[in-house]
Regions:
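Alpha-solenoid helical repeat scaffolds
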Residues: 1-326, 336-354
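Residues that scaffold, gate, or flank divalent-cation-dependent active/transport sites
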Residues: 329
């Protein structure tokens, strides 16, 4: 039947396949050949029906099923209509082989790529429980928790991974980031400094991340001397890291110190990543602190247009600027909007009650 199918004798091939199915019913190998033909002939409903039977059959090797699922994953990237069916197939296969690490990993990767981080984490958790030495699965599990804002599990899973991989610095970084999110700054500094010592000098990207995260942690503790030192070190390693340039510049502007340095860094971050609302806000706020109000208004309005209208901080900055320009009505409008959004400063209520 396979020979005849390859040589275009479709009817004869399917006649033989059906005869074979009378002898060995529901044989997944036969179904697979038939399904492949249906898919190539654009008879998707027939193909999907057979693939569903194959993937649900526990007797069919998981490795063969993974090949099928990866084929559908590739198709799903170029054909949106295939995506839902692929996800359904993944679920069918994982139920048939709940303790197969490779199959669970395949489903976890698919879910991660579609940003279904909570569901992806559940499958990566199965993988690391079955194969604790799979470092990449640990990394992905931690990133799932980070992307779903589950910092408790992010911290716990990175700690579990560190027991298995104590010399690999990346997991120290994840653990430190989780601790920063939980506002456990002293502990995060301990972890980040330990991990930083393990980073190879050739890995500039990771080294810069460790140093800037230490800068963030010390900033949160209001240890500005150490914070500035770490940001400077980070920029020595990676001078054009626009996130570090922006964050460092903004922290300086908040403290109303080293504003010319902040202005230079912020200008560079905006040239490296144009149209970024938070970066434009930083530059506008630095100009505000320098008393360059007209230019500040130009940059803060750019920030508003590029998405900053949904930020309490940016609306509060616009309110502060309009107040400086003598337009109390506009100032109050922006302050009220900032209050509604809810991520503005603690002083906002005082401004509104004046």
């Amino acid at each position: 039947a396979d020979f005849k199918l390859e040589h275009g004798e479709i009817e004869k091939a399917f006649s033989i396949y059906n005869e074979a199915l009378q002898v060995i019913p529901n044989n997944p190998l036969i179904y697979n050949e038939m399904a492949r033909y249906y898919l190539s002939d654009h008879e998707e409903e027939k193909a999907f029906n057979l693939y569903g039977k194959i993937l649900a059959d526990p007797s069919y090797k998981a490795s063969y099923k993974i090949d099928i699922l990866r084929k559908f994953s590739r198709l799903a990237k170029v054909e949106n209509r295939i995506h839902a069916q692929t996800k359904k197939f993944m679920g069918i296969a994982s139920k048939a082989h709940p303790y197969n690490p490779q199959l669970n990993n395949t489903f976890a990767e698919f879910l991660f790529e579609e940003n279904s981080f909570v569901m992806s984490a559940s499958y990566y958790k199965v993988v690391v429980d079955l194969r604790p030495n799979n470092y990449r699965a640990w990394q992905q599990l931690v990133l799932c928790y980070y992307n779903s804002n589950d910092y408790e599990k992010m911290i716990q899973s990175s700690e579990d991974a560190l027991e298995l991989f104590p010399t690999l610095p990346q997991m120290y970084f994840y653990n430190g980031m989780g601790l920063i999110q939980k506002k456990e700054y002293e502990k995060s500094i301990e972890v980040l400094e330990e991990g930083n010592d393990l980073v190879l000098s050739s890995d500039k990207g990771l080294k810069a991340q460790f140093l800037s995260s230490l800068g963030d942690a010390y900033h949160a503790l209001k240890d500005h001397i150490r914070s500035d030192e770490y940001f400077d070190l980070s920029l020595e390693v990676e001078p054009e890291n626009y996130y570090v340039l922006n964050n460092y510049a903004y922290y300086l502007s908040e403290r109303n110190t080293s504003l010319e340095k902040a202005k230079k860094m912020s200008k560079l971050s905006n040239s490296l990543k144009p149209e970024e609302a938070s970066f434009q806000d930083t530059y506008g706020w630095i100009l505000y602190q320098l008393g360059e109000f007209d230019d500040a208004l130009n940059w803060l309005k750019k920030s508003e247009i590029n998405g900053g209208n949904n930020s309490g901080v940016i609306n509060e900055h616009l309110g502060d600027l309009y107040q400086k320009l003598g337009n109390s009505k506009m100032a109050k409008t922006y302050w009220e909007k900032a209050f509604e959004i809810g991520d503005a400063s603690d002083e906002l209520k005082i401004k509104l009650n004046k």
